[in-house]
């Protein structure tokens, strides 16, 4: 992955705790410093992990791996009234052994998930473990495994290295619960390049064939197939300056005004250029072989530090009908620069948390360009266990609220006439010295984790920014706070920031603040969830 500073990509991609630095956060004292240690200590503490909720850093309402390690989400597919969500899983993480399989979880509402175990196992052939790819439901039996068979095209690296990536096929005839391999030969051999991975396959109904988008360093290659077994190169889209492109995404979506756009997305590392390290995307057109972008520079679906390997997938109603005006998205809340620092390693025996599933729509901006807006999936509202309605709160300086919590959502609309900045102090310590800051300042919105324990021990990636027009005099914020993550949605999801943060479990206060003036925090509501 980009940004690994020379560390073996395979070791990172496969997720091994050995040699990783895990942050152990004290739960009963505010003065003890975070501890770090090597793989042996991590393994021992994982086996003796706490079973009490008070000592747990497992997310309250976000998807987490049951044990060991997860990284890249794989695009969910809809089968028999539920989404089948696969993700990369390493059962040998705490033993220091690399290599991922595809584990499966199922869900009907994208909030509550049921673990189904490993669906596509690793190391069952000479080709070793499985990397990222995509699953499709072959309703037309184009591959010959039967109508409705689930076909996975996945990257593997025969020989155990990282420099010979090829695409292989697995298939399922039981609805995607278990898979077998289609031999040991690749369905798309490597043409002699280093980066050749993460196949994303879609059905091109207009042309009656399958299309694959493949990550090839600074290019996304496009391939055609009639049967998912034989692939032909068709063209490519090239963009440099944001690291090695990974986990491509390709879909069509209709805006509220009826405009239809194709979207090409990639996971990318823009840190070196002062850009995010998340999901970059372009709107444009696709003729089945070539993608033409509306603008050369990408937009970003998330501007925080920790929303990587994200996938989007179809939004369906209860009857399975596809909504052409929206999609869902989910991302891995971590970053390869500090993938082994979460306190869940020590406290809970796992490393792997996802973002909330988001509903993504195509909206038109005031300059007549188009962008993707995001909101938490609506079904989250069905799990509300407590609501605290604070109404309108006037603030001039800092106001500590009469509320304590670790895992919650807070929404508010900040309004002012003259102001420099305003926002919220999340997971504030009893003495006010530690907190996560979220809000606006001058001409940008921000999420800042500097004043609490967090994954970035280098101190470099602490505050994320997105543009903001202060003359608006108002801003809507919707913020999801959980035990190790914060997601901030600005102005109905025009911009989103997702970052890891590991506050002490006794840091439960919430405060509102203003800088250079007063403001009214309108319709301020806190919701807690039971999932």
Write out the residue ranges for each language-model feature:
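N-terminal secretory signal peptides
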Residues: 1-7, 18-25
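N-terminal export leaders
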Residues: 8-13
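C-terminal region of N-terminal signal peptides and the immediate post-cleavage residues
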Residues: 23-44
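Beta-rich carbohydrate-recognition and catalytic domains
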Residues: 37-199, 203-246, 254-303, 321-324, ...
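Beta-rich accessory regions
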Residues: 288-291, 301-308, 316-531
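Early-domain small/polar-rich strand-loop-helix modules and first-structured segments
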Residues: 312
